[in-house]
């Protein structure tokens, strides 16, 4: 498996391209969210991801895997997919049943929600790491590593009891170990190859400036918007000349509907000091040609366009009115 992983890394990221290797997602993980409303009603949602790219989901009502990408199936045969569907269906039904039957053991009250994430990651050197973590109501509950269950401090006695309980289910351990150490590594290696054109696409960002709400008397909030870029890593900074402005505030990199990304970066500054500031954007798709937007230029250009358009529109309206009145007057005569 290690030799295969190293060969794939060499194929995906040729020599001298290690910086790009850090940009592309190399981990596959599944997310499970199970909501328990009462002792008879529960709902689970499961989805599979390559980094931040959704690959598919599991429909627990029909017991089928729904692939979101043409290449999401990777090199798995229809028979293998069917086996996974049956395994997931048995797991989901068993998980819900066990939780509901052991409510009193863990002193839990309805409604509540359990979240879980499990998967594997192709890391530097060609090795593959595995992970499984669980959360209760959004708080860390436990993690499983090397066939050992580790209760999280936030989980308290409930997490300790759960780890003690799950160790008794050898069948569950065997299934998890097989999925994490065999199925997942094979899948991540395959899907990275089959989805390479999409995974390694380059989409250039759009950038523009705006003014945010005033942070105080005599102050301006300068906002630099960067949107539509892929892959996710991006560098955005407010600058004065070549000097980075340490007061720059960066928001979270958020997903767009088309699987590109959006980032907003702000700077609070005295109004008289805004002149000469610029927003610089670095992204792999730009190939070293950084985007630089100067504060005031976009505003002045907008005013110039407005100053040209408004008089033209006024003249056009006056001409139409004059023509209409002249035409109406001639009809009367």
From Swiss-Prot:
Extracellular side: 18-302
Localization per record: Cell membrane; Endosome membrane; Lysosome membrane
Residue ranges that the Swiss-Prot or TrEMBL entry lists as coiled coil: none
Motif mapping: Internalization signal: 329-332
UniProt domain Ig-like: residue ranges: 197-295
Gene3D superfamilies the UniProt entry points to: Immunoglobulins, MHC class I-like antigen recognition-like
Membrane disposition: Single-pass type I membrane protein
Signal peptide: 1-17
Membrane-crossing segments per the record: 303-323
InterPro entries given in the database record: Ig-like_dom, Ig-like_dom_sf, Ig-like_fold, Ig_C1-set, MHC_class-I_related, MHC_I-like_Ag-recog, MHC_I-like_Ag-recog_sf, MHC_I/II-like_Ag-recog
Main location: membrane
UniProtKB keywords: Adaptive immunity, Cell membrane, Disulfide bond, Endosome, Glycoprotein, Immunity, Immunoglobulin domain, Lysosome, Membrane, Signal, Transmembrane, Transmembrane helix
Cellular component, GO annotation: endosome membrane; external side of plasma membrane; extracellular space; lysosomal membrane
Disulfide bond residue pairs: 120-184, 149-163, 224-279
Glycosylated residues in this chain: 38, 75, 146
GO molecular function, one term: endogenous lipid antigen binding
BP-aspect Gene Ontology terms: adaptive immune response; antigen processing and presentation, endogenous lipid antigen via MHC class Ib; antigen processing and presentation, exogenous lipid antigen via MHC class Ib; positive regulation of T cell mediated cytotoxicity
Cytoplasmic face residues: 324-333
SUPFAM superfamilies for the chain: Immunoglobulin, MHC antigen-recognition domain
Quaternary organization: Heterodimer with B2M (beta-2-microglobulin). Interacts with saposin C.
Note: During protein synthesis and maturation, CD1 family members bind endogenous lipids that are replaced by lipid or glycolipid antigens when the proteins are internalized and pass through endosomes or lysosomes, before trafficking back to the cell surface. Interaction with saposin C is required for the loading of bacterial lipid antigens onto CD1B in the lysosome.
Function noted in UniProt: Antigen-presenting protein that binds self and non-self lipid and glycolipid antigens and presents them to T-cell receptors on natural killer T-cells.
Name of the featured protein: T-cell surface glycoprotein CD1b1
Organism from which the protein derives: Cavia porcellus (Guinea pig)
